[in-house]
Amino acid sequence: RSIMNETRLPRFHEPKAPRFVLTDRQGKFALGIGGYVRATAEYDFGGIVKDVDFYPALIPNKGSADRARNQFQMDISTSTLFLKLVGHTKRLGDFVVYTAANFRGDGKTFELQNAYATFLGFTLGYSYGNFMDLAALPPTIDFAGPNGSAFYRTTQLSYMCNKLKNWKFGVGVEMPSVDGTTNQYLTINTQRMPDFTASAQYNWNANSHLKLAAIVRSMTYSSSVDNKAHSKAGYGLQASTSFNVTPKWQVYGQVNYGKGIGQYLND
């Protein structure tokens, strides 16, 4: 049970430790099955976004034909199911294999959210990237989260070191995601290089921390003018924090700066 709780991802919308757990005869391995059903309802008086999530970039201009004066919506597609296998071996120490999905696919179909394994500080699989801070995201009813925050999932191989007291250091090699404005002459190409990330985090109590993160990337595109592939460098810097002023008052915040990281930020 302690491993189940300690390895929970620190995001408000992530499910807690499972209620149903199966263990082997020796008690070295445990498989947890869990999830939740979540329904939200909202009413918009001023015509915001024709989407169950709030994305400021989708707000139509005043006078636009897409602008709705009033709008009522309900959604249950963020309901989540997950499987979590935890255990301990001599070679791997404590390990976790985790997979989760909700119904956010096209037509509310089942969609993968996380699928990864962690052992000896390594994370291998599909999960949240290193250039973001789950613990610095405030609790929100809206599933998309706060505007301007770094938020993305990616296939990765990352390593987190927490052997120093109060400190965590992380590095990662991640599958890139490139998006941008194209035209008849320019198209997004297959990518040649992974994204490289690094982070350092200092914790001064269980609910307070300061994190610095960076990302370096190469973005490849094709031009029909010279029939060649070109690359542009991108980078990002992030400072984030969360700390408790009182036992019931938690402060969250983050600042992001960079070039070519727009697809990793909530808009």
Describe each model-derived feature in a short phrase:
Residues R1-R11:
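Cleavable N-terminal export/targeting peptides
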Residues R8-L9, F110, P146, T187, ...:
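Intrinsically disordered, low-complexity segments enriched in polar/charged residues with Gly/Pro
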Residues P10-F20:
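Short linear interaction motifs
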Residues P15-K16, N61-K62, P139-T140, A233:
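General secondary-structure edge motif
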Residues T23-D53, G63-D179, R192, T197, ...:
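Outer membrane beta-barrel
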Residues P56-K62, D179-Q191, T220-A229, Q263-D267:
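Solvent-exposed loop segments that connect transmembrane elements
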Residues N203-D267:
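Detector for outer-membrane/organellar transmembrane beta-barrel domains
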